[in-house]
Amino acid sequence: ASLCILAALLPLQSHAESSADQWQWRATVYLWLPSLGGETSFPPSGGGPSIDVSADQILDSLNFAFMGALEGRKGPWGMATDVIYLDLGSSKKATRDFGIGRIELPASVDADLRLDITGWVWTLTGSYEALSTETFSMDVLAGARMLDLQQDLRWNLNGDISALPLPGRSGSSQVEDTLWDAIVGLKGRATFGAERNWYVPYYLDVGAGDSDLTWQGIVGLGYSFSSVDVTGVWRYLDYDLGSHTPIQSINFNGPALGVTFRF
């Protein structure tokens, strides 16, 4: 398992002068199938060194996702909002894909791990059409992105753990954080084909605030019907929070398929 989304990826085509002062809207629903990576340190409830895990080594399933976007445009001005809810979780048996502080893991020790991650990504932006030709458009945008994330880890250590300064063989820990970041970026599309129904949408933003750095990139291929667009893209969203927080980094990376309704 941001903002502006697939809807924000699809800038509205130029309008006739008679409709230039009217709001034009796009609503998008889409399926995003991201893989997830990042580093998190879970402090044991009974004290001792943290349990360190890499999400990409544990997670392999998306339990539930809701994703949608809304974009409005009036003349060269636009606004967009994008919301994503992710629920990911997975278990791994007899794994050594974890760390315990800076302590070397004994050769006989492995663990059964269960990692669950739930969260919201909400992006809100305003935009201005900086460039528009028959085949290419580009908007500049600014806004904010919110990430609300909760991670739960349960573990059971196997083998001889006498050398490890932990209060017990089993445990659980939870870390959560809510981040707000200001973002700036570009979005647009390049059209091609005899009737210019095919297009390549693109989106890029970068920002900071509660996180040290966040950025998002999207690129893909779309087709416009009379009142509906169908788009397939690759989307990458990354957060770097620094080593001073339990959630040190997290990223979402994968394909998305969206359907946009224009009205």
Kindly give the residue locations of the regions a language model identified.
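Short glycine/proline- and aromatic-enriched beta-strand/turn motifs that initiate or cap beta-hairpins
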Residues: 15-86, 193
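Short loop/turn motifs that connect adjacent beta-strands in outer-membrane beta-barrel proteins
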Residues: 15-23, 131-137, 192-198, 226-227
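Residues on the lipid-exposed face of transmembrane beta-strands in outer-membrane beta-barrel proteins
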Residues: 27-29, 68-74, 124-128, 142-144, ...
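Transmembrane beta-strands of outer-membrane beta-barrel pores
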Residues: 31-35, 55, 74-76, 83-89, ...
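Extracellular/periplasm-exposed beta-strand and loop segments of Gram-negative cell-envelope proteins
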Residues: 35-63, 85-120, 147-179, 209, ...
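Detector for outer-membrane/organellar transmembrane beta-barrel domains
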Residues: 169-205
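Predominantly the C-terminal beta-signal and adjacent terminal strand-loop region
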Residues: 217-263
